[in-house]
């Protein structure tokens, strides 16, 4: 049937244009979600849920308000907060920091997303380390001398932060062989760090 009514013709044209624009927007958005949240690690794909939003900034400020800019105090306070959140395996996609806090549980992915986000908004250099079936956070604390072994990535010292061990301390011992390390990731740029040299000493 031919459409003789001009109004209906223009309406259908308008609806078609809106549909096409919406479709293009969804494809464009999906591309950036994949680009910014998914990283290929060998045979698997890592999905990050890190945030630098107002919620994370306010929470980090609140948790470190009594530290007076003391870095060890800030990092340990944030680590204590995250490690006291109950560990529970999450069979779905990793949760955002806010979801971990509100639901009061998470696995290593979830709790590491929370910790690394809190540290990042305070300006710390932090990365994820992926090992078989686990993930942990590493932090560079500049010239602070802690009497603990550290992971040296390209000759730069990083202390291990373990989110699944209740009240663990900065400089948690490496429980894996160096050869088990699948990747070191900057989740805020969603890219793997090129590793030329890796030591634990």
What are these regions (language model features)?
Residues 1-201:
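A structural boundary/capping signal
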């Amino acid at each position: 049937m031919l459409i003789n009514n001009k109004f209906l013709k223009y309406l259908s044209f308008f609806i078609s244009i809106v549909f096409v624009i919406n479709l293009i927007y969804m494809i464009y958005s999906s591309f950036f979600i994949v680009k910014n949240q998914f990283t290929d690690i060998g045979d698997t794909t890592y999905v990050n849920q890190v945030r630098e939003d107002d919620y994370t900034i306010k929470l980090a400020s609140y948790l470190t308000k009594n530290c007076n800019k003391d870095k060890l105090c800030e990092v340990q306070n944030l680590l204590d907060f995250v490690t006291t959140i109950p560990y529970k395996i999450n069979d779905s996609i990793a949760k955002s920091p806010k979801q971990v806090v509100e639901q009061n549980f998470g696995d290593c992915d979830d709790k590491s997303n929370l910790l690394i986000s809190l540290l990042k908004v305070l300006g710390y250099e932090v990365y994820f380390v992926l090992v078989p079936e686990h993930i942990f956070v590493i932090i560079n604390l500049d010239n602070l001398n802690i009497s603990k072994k550290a992971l040296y990535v390209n000759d730069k010292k990083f202390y291990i932060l373990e989110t699944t061990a209740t009240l663990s301390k900065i400089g948690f011992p490496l429980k894996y062989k160096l050869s088990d390390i699948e990747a070191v990731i900057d989740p805020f740029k969603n890219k793997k760090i090129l590793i030329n040299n890796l030591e634990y000493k």
